[in-house]
Amino acid sequence: MNESAKTLVAGLGSTHGDDQAGWLVAENVASQCRGYQHVTVRRATIPLDVLDWLDGVDVLHVCDACQMTHDHRQLQRYNLVEGQFINSDVSMNSEMSGTLLSLRSRGSHDFGLPDVLRLAAQIQQLPKQVIVWAIAGTDFQPGAGMTVETTSAAAQTVVEILKELRM
């Protein structure tokens, strides 16, 4: 990672069980990056919040919990390339697209993460590099705690982001 590249790590979440994963990642990355002047870490409750923070950002890491039924991996990393989410193996299939589309898009007036990233591109605010960390979750009930599996995947997400920040 280029030390001069301004990086934003955004953790999306809520108080609903495994949906806390993005916030947990943000808190842990922030505690590990206090001396990194080029790194900003924020917590968001809706993807649209991220749009307000993109000015001057070169690299964006977005961390969010989602229900993934097509894959048994607890953590998946996607790069946004020319409007498409690409993982290390193949282009994102329609099931994953639907998963990302539904992330925090609960009403007709809400924007899901893909919508926010498309809007950022249209208004020329999309960072040069966008990485989405999809953390598998199973329990999204209000007031529930995080499951052991999702907590572990969130911890692994922190490790992976820190590796990239130190490159």
Feature locations, PLM:
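N-terminal catalytic or cofactor-binding beta/alpha core of small enzyme domains
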Residues: M1-K128, V132-I135, A144-A155, E160-M167
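Conserved catalytic-site region of short-chain dehydrogenase/reductase
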Residues: D139
